């Protein structure tokens, strides 16, 4: 990731491991100790969020927590196993240059939702209409935490994207740069 985006970016990994799982805890520790651009976050101890213990929240929604962090100004949401392409880097650079609050990428015919859970970004240091983007995100989280889908079963498919569509997209749509190879004219 840093080869394409640069050393200033930090990868944040949210995890839920028992302290008794020494092998995996050791692997996480080794990963963090050998990579100074990785921030490990135990979802049972999340300071600065409306939920200190996020174990009941659908795991794919954990990756949205940086939107509540006052130390985060720019945030990209990707799956851990995603490969970053030069095309994506160019799209992100275009979005960052725009000053817009949200970035959404859809690059496959099956990407038929406004915001893919693992292909979007947020600028928290900008305005989103008449409010700051941070304020918009706090409001979104207030409604996200009241939505039963936020607490979906771990094996569920798509609750993260539905949450973004319901609670973020209504305000983000007009504040977004969208890169869409297939569906833009039809859906959004």
Residue ranges of predicted features:
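Short, acidic, metal-binding catalytic loop of nucleotide-sugar glycosyltransferases
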Residues: 1-8
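Structural recognition of the beta-strand scaffold that forms the well-ordered cores
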Residues: 12-13, 102-105, 119-121
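Catalytic phosphate/metal-binding cores of nucleic-acid and nucleotide-processing enzymes, i.e., regions
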Residues: 12-15, 37-39, 95-99
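Active-site-proximal specificity loops/subdomain of glycosyltransferases
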Residues: 16-74, 83
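Conserved glycosyltransferase catalytic-site signature
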Residues: 60-64, 89, 157-162
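Conserved donor-nucleotide/metal-binding helix-loop-beta segment in metal-dependent transferases, i.e.
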Residues: 83-116
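Catalytic core and acceptor-binding pocket of nucleotide-sugar-dependent glycosyltransferases
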Residues: 108-115, 122-188
């Amino acid at each position: 990731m840093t080869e394409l985006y640069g050393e200033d970016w930090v990868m944040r990994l949210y995890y839920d491991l028992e302290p008794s799982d020494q092998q995996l805890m050791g692997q996480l520790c080794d990963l963090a100790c050998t990579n100074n651009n990785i921030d490990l976050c135990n979802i049972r101890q999340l300071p600065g969020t409306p939920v200190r213990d996020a174990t009941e929240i659908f795991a794919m929604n954990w990756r949205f927590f940086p939107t509540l962090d006052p130390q985060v100004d720019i945030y990209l949401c990707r799956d851990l196993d995603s490969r970053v392409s030069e095309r994506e880097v160019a799209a992100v650079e275009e979005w960052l240059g725009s000053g817009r609050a949200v970035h959404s990428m859809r690059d496959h015919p099956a990407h038929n939702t406004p915001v893919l859970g693992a292909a979007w970004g947020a600028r928290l240091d900008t305005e989103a209409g008449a409010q700051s983007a941070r304020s918009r995100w706090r409001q979104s989280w207030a409604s996200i935490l009241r939505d039963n889908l936020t607490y979906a079963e771990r094996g569920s498919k798509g609750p993260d994207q539905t949450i973004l569509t319901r609670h973020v997209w209504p305000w983000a749509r007009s504040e977004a740069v969208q890169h869409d190879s297939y569906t833009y004219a039809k859906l959004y």
